[in-house]
């Protein structure tokens, strides 16, 4: 047996012995009749206590004579004879308990408290005071075991080091990792901030189907499921777009939705098959209005959630305080590949030659617009570090966007980039029913030619457009990627509580 395997076997034996001892303690509690009591009530959380009393001097706290009730998980314990110090962790953070034998009912300290284990959930009552080192603490007069933990916590010095285990057992990650807890608290604040921002501007939050007969609103491979009662194959939605625009046809002129999308694609540091998007639609607006709204949204969130428009990310600092850069797709190609002759981007053969020269395999189904977009992705996207809007996307790769009035080969569309990755996509919506029908047909032809991500033909959506969609602009923002930026996280798994994982065999 190798040294590594031997160590692993020893760890399993240690865990089994630890769990056996803990189960024996639980059995003793069961004999006493109340192994999992549910009659303890706390009146404060640790962060509330620190916010209210950290600034007070020891003498002032003693004079106030404040009694509090707290509950949480025992993370550390230092037993020093007749007295002990405990670190209790709750949703707000940590608070120290001072536990003295003579201040508790007879037998509690030696017969109960000293036999409890790290990870157990406790309830404590007592008076606030400060130690000689100035740490806010609770001098316990009552201490109860509320939940017996049968498994030990991760090593207190090293935490949960295995990345796979962090994602598979997120509960352990959250117990032992302050950074993870703060990431998901920030995510919650971002979502609340988005909702507040949108409602303040007259948008109504709505919900649209997660299972669809025809998946639409994006170019992606869908997940397929089966509805037994209807005996019908259905698709998990890849985007809510077409349903949201139906609502605009119906008269809801400003709508937004924050919800899950599902795309049957690869998993990477940027991609999870199940992800969260915010989409909005705004009648009587164009893509330029949404550029302004997007800039305002990110600036507002940075200030309100993080308290600063300068947001650190790795070695970079994103500046949301100054005006965001704006480039057309072709300007970006020229900027990051200066040798490009702009005239070559207007010619299929010349553009194809450029694409192949930089390692792009050009599919037979691609037209000029797709080739130019692929060139942009290859030469420019990774360089768009500071907040940047890219405009003038080809109509070929924008089947739902409105054609530009001056040049019908491009659309009134933008994508928003930060840190070298796309964060948002918006455009003036196509509201010409006949043009939309033709573009759907073009997508059907592309699918027949082998493009698995091409869109389906949605006849009912065309029917909705035939009733009249007002001039409208729409925007989609990837919430997971947004959270990555605001929390300095470099893999999407760090900002999704339960990311997709291959099952353990």
Swiss-Prot record:
- Cell compartment(s), UniProt: Cytoplasm
**UniProt keyword Protein biosynthesis present:** yes
A cellular component term, taken from the record's GO annotations: cytosol
| Binding-site positions, Mg(2+) 2 | 422
What InterPro entries would the database entry show? Aa-tRNA-synt_II (IPR004364), aa-tRNA-synth_II (IPR006195), aa-tRNA-synth_II/BPL/LPL (IPR045864), Lys-tRNA-ligase_II (IPR002313), Lys-tRNA-ligase_II_bac/euk (IPR034762), Lys-tRNA-ligase_II_N (IPR044136), Lys-tRNA-synth_II_C (IPR018149), NA-bd_OB-fold (IPR012340)
A molecular function (GO) term: tRNA binding
Query: Which keywords describe this protein according to UniProt?
Result: Aminoacyl-tRNA synthetase, ATP-binding, Cytoplasm, Ligase, Magnesium, Metal-binding, Nucleotide-binding, Protein biosynthesis
- Enzyme Commission code: 6.1.1.6
The record's section on PROSITE patterns has:
AA_TRNA_LIGASE_II
How does it associate, per the subunit comment? Homodimer.
What this protein is called in its record is Lysine--tRNA ligase
Q: Which organism is it from?
A: Salmonella arizonae (strain ATCC BAA-731 / CDC346-86 / RSK2980)
Query: Upper taxonomic classification of the species?
Result: Bacteria, Pseudomonadati, Pseudomonadota, Gammaproteobacteria, Enterobacterales
The gene name reads lysS
């Amino acid at each position: 047996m190798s040294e590594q395997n031997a160590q692993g076997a020893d760890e399993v034996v240690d865990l089994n012995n630890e769990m056996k001892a803990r189960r024996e303690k639980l059995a003793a509690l069961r004999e006493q009749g109340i192994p999992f009591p549910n009659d303890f009530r706390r009146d404060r959380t640790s962060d509330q206590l620190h916010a209210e009393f950290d600034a007070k001097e020891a003498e002032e706290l003693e004079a106030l004579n404040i009694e509090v009730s707290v509950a949480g998980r025992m993370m550390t314990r230092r037993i020093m004879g007749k007295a002990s110090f405990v670190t209790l962790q709750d949703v707000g953070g940590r608070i120290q308990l001072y536990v003295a034998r003579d201040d508790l009912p007879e037998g509690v300290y030696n017969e109960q408290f000293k036999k409890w284990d790290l990870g157990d959930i406790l309830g404590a009552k007592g008076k606030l005071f400060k130690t000689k080192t100035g740490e806010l603490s609770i001098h316990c007069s009552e201490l109860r075991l509320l939940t017996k933990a049968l498994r030990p916590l991760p090593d207190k010095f090293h935490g949960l080091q295995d990345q796979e285990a962090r994602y598979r057992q997120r509960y352990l990650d959250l117990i032992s990792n302050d950074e993870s807890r703060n990431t998901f608290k920030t995510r919650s604040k971002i979502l609340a901030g988005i909702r507040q921002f949108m409602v303040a501007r007259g948008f109504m939050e709505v919900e649209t189907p997660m299972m669809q007969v025809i998946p639409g609103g994006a170019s992606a491979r869908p997940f397929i499921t089966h509805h037994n009662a209807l005996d019908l194959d259905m698709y998990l939605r890849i985007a809510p777009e077409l349903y949201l625009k139906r609502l605009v046809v119906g008269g809801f002129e400003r709508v937004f939705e924050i919800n899950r999308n599902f795309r049957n694609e690869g998993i990477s540091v940027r991609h999870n098959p199940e992800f969260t998007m915010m989409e909005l639609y705004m009648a009587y607006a164009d893509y330029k209005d949404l550029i302004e709204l997007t800039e305002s949204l990110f600036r507002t969130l940075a200030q309100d959630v993080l308290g600063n428009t300068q947001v650190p990310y790795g070695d970079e600092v994103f500046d949301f305080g100054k005006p965001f850069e704006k480039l057309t797709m072709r300007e970006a190609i020229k900027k990051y590949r200066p040798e490009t002759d702009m005239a070559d981007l207007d010619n299929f053969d010349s553009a194809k030659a450029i694409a192949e020269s930089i390692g792009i395999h050009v599919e037979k189904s691609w037209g000029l617009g797709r080739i130019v977009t692929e060139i942009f992705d290859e030469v420019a996207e990774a360089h768009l570090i500071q907040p940047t809007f890219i405009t003038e996307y080809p109509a070929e790769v924008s089947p739902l966007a409105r054609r530009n009035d001056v040049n019908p080969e491009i659309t009134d569309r933008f994508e928003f980039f930060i840190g070298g990755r796309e964060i948002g996509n918006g455009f003036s919506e196509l509201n010409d029913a006949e043009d939309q029908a033709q573009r759907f047909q073009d997508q059907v032809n592309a699918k027949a030619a082998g493009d698995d991500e091409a869109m389906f033909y949605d006849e009912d959506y065309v029917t909705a457009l035939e009733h009249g969609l007002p001039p409208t602009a729409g925007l989609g923002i990837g919430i997971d990627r947004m959270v990555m930026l605001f929390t300095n996280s470099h893999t999407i798994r760090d900002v999704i509580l339960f990311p997709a994982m291959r099952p353990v065999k």
